[in-house]
């Protein structure tokens, strides 16, 4: 099946993507967050984000609209946040332009929630123990300076150069 007209010679080499075979089902895990009602922008205004340049879309597309929206997204100068450097990364302040570690951001701003979204850069060069160590160091540093901040760690997404792995799920 192709996505181009039959008279197009390139039609035979442009396949239509296969729909997802496995439906998304709720994860049964003690770590899974329960579904909640929409809390609106007041709730979102309390969330700070540490991550790579892909998070900047939250600001450029005006998804964050509160009085502190410019202070809610923190990205390293390089635009990349490899998981292996979570414990040493410094983030460019959208307010001062200074580069500061995550715990100082939280000490000054006291966010109710901190979402950590590392990039998968160089992830193949680290192992499970290293990842656990850098996350633990970062979380402990943040908690020491902002003990009431709730921390949400985003998972790293699987990366593949083709659709061979399209059926990867949390059940694997």
List the model feature ranges, each with a label.
Residues 128-138, 168-172:
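Charged helix-capping and loop-helix junction motifs
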Residues 41-130:
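Conserved SGNH/GDSL esterase-like catalytic core that processes O-acyl groups on lipids
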Residues 2-46:
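N-terminal, intrinsically disordered, polar/charged segments of Gram-positive cell-envelope systems
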């Amino acid at each position: 099946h192709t996505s181009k007209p039959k008279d197009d010679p390139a039609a035979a080499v442009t396949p239509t993507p296969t729909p997802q075979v496995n439906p998304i089902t709720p994860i049964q895990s003690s770590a899974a967050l329960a579904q909640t009602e929409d809390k609106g922008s007041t709730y979102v205004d309390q969330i700070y984000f540490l991550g790579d340049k892909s998070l900047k879309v939250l600001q450029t597309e005006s998804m964050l609209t509160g009085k502190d929206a410019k202070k809610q997204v923190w990205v390293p100068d390089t635009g990349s946040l490899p998981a292996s450097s979570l414990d040493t990364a410094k983030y460019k302040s959208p307010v001062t332009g200074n580069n500061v570690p995550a715990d100082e951001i939280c000490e000054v701003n006291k966010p109710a929630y901190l979402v950590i979204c590392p990039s998968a850069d160089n992830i193949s060069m680290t192992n499970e123990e290293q990842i656990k160590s850098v996350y633990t160091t970062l979380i402990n540093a943040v908690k020491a300076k902002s003990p009431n901040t709730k921390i949400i760690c985003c998972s790293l997404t699987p990366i593949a150069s083709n659709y061979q792995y399209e059926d990867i799920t949390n059940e694997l």
